[in-house]
Structure formats: structure tokens, C-alpha cells
């Protein structure tokens, strides 16, 4: 399976129009059997953008379904006559192609808040980072009330990157879970053992997300 992470940056003042645009798109994605994990906005940090994740079996399926979606008269009417009648609403689009790691669960959204985390591994350390997550981290996240939604690597290029998503009932629950996780002796031991030859992670990026009203449930 391929997972496509897409972020749309709205033109100034156009975020409401972008939501309208994507709410219509969500219905047409379903019509054309384009799987969607969810639609999100930033809970903390950058505003004015919406992110969603497509799911498809392979790139051939993507090409066929996206072509059918783009040719749908209902979509053309929505773009030409409705959301963009007063100008372009999207300033920039970013997308990343991802594939699940062997230890990832099948992604499901069951909680109110999601956290998108990107770890750039130290050179040559990505296999060790995968081992730590598969052997220790996922289990300890669950122990401390964090939902393991999905774990991915990038499809193209020579990326040294691990991407994953966690879920929480609320922002307060997120704070509590991370606090107890960081002080867990099992985690401290696992981290120390995995880093005895040096740190595994060079940089970490985090986004706190909340599903939109039109995001699929469950």
C-alpha cells in the first residue's frame, strides 16, 4: 500500500473556501474509491493549511483513480464555478509518498488529537531506530496511553527518515502520556542500550493535528 501525505497551504483569507473545496472533494474521493485516512488542521503552530492522507494499492491505481476524479463533472463544476470563482484558493501543495514499516499497525483514527512526528536518523542509524521502535517504543507508547496509528518510511530517494502518527483523547492527555513515558525506566533503559554507540536521531519535527469536521471517522 502507498500512503500519500498532502498539505495544502491556502491563499490569505481563503482557508474557509479551502475547507469547502475539500469537503466536496472528500465525497468525490469516496465515489472514486480513493481511500482517505483523514483530513487535519494544525492544532498548534502554522495555520492556514489543511493536510490529508490518501491510501491506494500502488501507483497504477493512483493514476487511474486520480484521473477519474479529475474528469468528474461534479468536481470540475466545484472548482470552476464555486470555490475558485473569486480567485485561486491554494498557494502551495506539498506531498510525500510513504509506505508502512513492517511493525506498523494498519492505520485507524479513533482519537480526537493526532501527532505527526518525523525523525531524521543519524547516518547509518535508521535500522537501529526501527529496531528500537519495533522492540520497545510502540509497546511503551501503548502502556502510557498513546495510540500507535501508523509508522512509515518515504518511498522515493535515499531518505534516512522515519515518520509516525500517534493519537490522544486530548492535548492534556498528550502532555501526561509523554511525561510518564519519558520517566519510564524501561524506556530509559531501552534508549540507553540502543544509543551505546551514539545517538540514533539527528532531528525531530512535530505537528499537532485535529481532524476536520468532514474527516472520515474510525
Residue ranges and their predicted role:
Residues 1-189, 193-218:
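Short S/T/G/P-rich N-terminal loop/turn motif that feeds into the first structured element of a domain
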Amino acid at each position: 500500500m502507498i500512503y500519500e501525505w498532502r498539505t495544502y497551504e491556502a491563499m490569505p483569507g481563503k482557508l474557509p473556501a479551502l475547507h469547502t473545496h475539500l469537503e466536496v472533494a472528500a465525497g468525490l474521493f469516496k465515489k472514486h474509491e480513493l481511500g482517505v485516512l483523514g483530513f487535519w488542521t494544525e492544532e498548534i503552530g502554522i495555520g492556514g493549511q489543511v493536510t490529508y492522507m490518501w491510501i491506494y494499492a500502488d501507483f497504477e491505481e493512483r493514476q487511474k483513480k486520480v484521473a477519474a476524479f479529475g474528469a468528474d463533472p461534479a468536481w470540475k463544476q466545484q472548482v470552476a464555478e464555486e470555490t475558485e470563482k473569486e480567485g485561486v484558493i491554494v498557494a502551495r501543495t506539498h506531498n510525500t509518498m510513504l509506505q508502512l514499516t513492517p511493525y506498523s499497525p494498519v492505520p485507524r483514527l479513533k482519537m480526537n488529537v493526532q501527532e505527526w512526528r518525523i525523525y531524521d536518523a543519524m547516518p547509518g542509524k535508521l535500522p537501529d531506530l526501527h529496531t528500537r521502535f519495533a522492540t520497545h517504543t510502540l509497546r511503551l507508547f501503548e502502556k502510557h496511553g498513546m495510540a500507535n496509528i501508523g509508522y512509515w518510511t518515504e518511498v522515493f530517494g535515499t531518505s534516512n527518515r522515519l515518520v509516525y502518527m500517534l493519537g490522544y483523547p486530548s492535548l492534556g492527555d498528550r502532555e501526561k502520556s509523554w511525561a510518564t513515558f519519558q520517566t519510564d525506566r524501561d524506556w530509559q533503559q531501552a534508549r540507553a542500550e540502543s544509543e551505546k554507540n551514539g545517538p540514533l536521531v539527528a532531528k525531530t519535527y512535530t505537528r499537532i493535528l485535529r481532524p476536520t469536521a468532514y474527516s472520515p471517522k474510525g
